[in-house]
């Protein structure tokens, strides 16, 4: 076994090395500008991917009726603009009214509109 004197010397030497290096948890070498830019870009990329994943998760349950409207033929000349169907926007007052309706009422209203607009 090691003697107490040798153990004490080793402890003093290790303490002196740790005390005089004075790293304070910082890296010993400074990072280069390219390394900092790479880390910044990686952080931005991770943040963007997290936002896209969150948005994709929120949009999974959203139903878009625009795809159904694009497949239908236009009924009026005013609906045709340079060969394309003009998209109808949902105004804020219509949106508030739609939110207040129950899902069953929305399904019935959607089916009524769908059957009325077919040629």
UniProtKB/Swiss-Prot annotation:
Name assigned to this protein: Parathyroid hormone
Superkingdom: Eukaryota
* Gene Ontology BP annotations: adenylate cyclase-activating G protein-coupled receptor signaling pathway; bone mineralization; cell-cell signaling; homeostasis of number of cells within a tissue; intracellular calcium ion homeostasis; magnesium ion homeostasis; negative regulation of apoptotic process in bone marrow cell; negative regulation of gene expression
Q: Where is the signal peptide?
A: 1-25
Q: Which InterPro entries match?
A: PTH, PTH/PTH-rel
Localization of this protein = Secreted
**What is the gene name?**
PTH
Name one molecular function that GO assigns to this entry. peptide hormone receptor binding
What family does the entry list? Belongs to the parathyroid hormone family.
The entry's propeptide annotation covers 26-31
Chief location bin: secreted
Q: Please provide one cellular component term from the Gene Ontology annotations of this protein.
A: extracellular space
Q: How does it assemble?
A: Interacts with PTH1R (via N-terminal extracellular domain).
UniProt function note:
Parathyroid hormone elevates calcium level by dissolving the salts in bone and preventing their renal excretion. Acts by binding to its receptor, PTH1R, activating G protein-coupled receptor signaling. Stimulates [1-14C]-2-deoxy-D-glucose (2DG) transport and glycogen synthesis in osteoblastic cells.
Q: Keyword annotations for this protein?
A: Cleavage on pair of basic residues, Hormone, Secreted, Signal
